[in-house]
A protein has these predicted regions:
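Conserved N-terminal beta1-alpha1 strand-loop-helix module at the mouth
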Residues: 1-108, 113-141, 167, 172-175, ...
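Flexible glycine-rich beta->alpha loop in the catalytic core of nucleotide-sugar glycosyltransferases
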Residues: 148-149, 195, 202-203
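Paired acidic/hydrophobic, glycine-rich loop segments that form the ligand-binding mouth/hinge
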Residues: 99, 197-198
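Flexible, gly/pro- and Lys/Arg-enriched active-site loops
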Residues: 103-109, 147-170
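Short amphipathic alpha-helical segments
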Residues: 160-163, 180, 184
Length: 237
């Protein structure tokens, strides 16, 4: 879909900020070693990723800033928003579109004051609709739930059932699923209500050609099964 119209969980506000259904590519420095970060993200973008998150908590600050600035330029050229994990100040300095906050990552309201009304701010809600309700009230732009499958990135994260994706659509915000997602198990999450599939290892654990092909496969899943792309696909009962 070239241009979205407000529908379901995608308000005019969300669309104006650049949010759309699809693959949410999340970087991992343990997978993207040896200077592979930029080429890997470029491959994901070629494959159709609609949102990118830079997640790096251990590198020195100057290195993080340089990587974030480079990613911001790549994403800007592709017309795709870049989100910074857990660091509103880094998001501001590198010119990213916004920030993603976990439950221990600080105040959403403070991040909003730092970044402004135009910024995209996402919130981790685990499998808890009460957390989602609070994030919604605090002005989150999207709500993230998971983990749905075993995850090597965050093996200790609380588990979630697909039904939380359906239930969370009551908030009228884009719904993100995360945790062990691959091209083989993503379809069911989209059918359950996921607007975005946030993928780490299931995307970036491979060479550049593999990353691009996996991204294309995720994009096809949305084209086939997300209601904003195809309302003719029968839904599971």
């Amino acid at each position: 879909v070239a241009e979205l119209t407000p529908s379901g969980t995608f308000s005019a506000r969300a669309i104006a900020k650049g949010l759309k259904p699809g693959l949410y590519a999340i970087t991992d420095s343990h997978l993207l070693t040896g200077g592979r970060l930029l080429v890997a993200v470029e491959a994901a973008l070629r494959g159709g990723a609609v949102l990118v998150q830079y997640r790096e908590k251990s590198a020195p600050q100057p290195e993080r800033l340089k990587q974030a600035q480079d990613l911001a330029a790549i994403c800007h050229n592709a017309g795709v928003p870049l989100i910074i994990n857990d660091d509103p100040e880094l998001a501001r300095r590198c010119g990213a579109a916004g920030v993603h906050l976990g439950q221990s990552d600080g105040s959403l309201a403070l991040a909003r004051r730092q970044l402004g009304d135009h910024a995209i701010i996402g919130a981790t809600c685990h499998a808890d609709l009460a957390l989602a309700s609070r994030a919604d009230a605090d002005g989150a732009d999207y709500l993230a739930f998971g983990r749905f499958f075993n995850s090597t990135t965050k093996p200790g994260a609380p588990s979630a059932k697909p039904s939380v994706l359906t239930e969370s659509r009551q908030f009228g915000k884009p719904v993100t699923a995360i945790g062990g997602i691959t091209t083989d198990n993503g379809e069911g999450l989209i059918r359950a209500g996921a607007d975005l599939l946030a993928v780490v290892g299931g995307l970036f654990n491979g060479d550049v050609a593999t990353i691009e092909e996996r991204a294309r496969c995720f994009s096809r899943l949305f084209a086939q099964h997300h209601p904003l792309f195809s309302s003719s696909v029968p839904q599971e009962s």
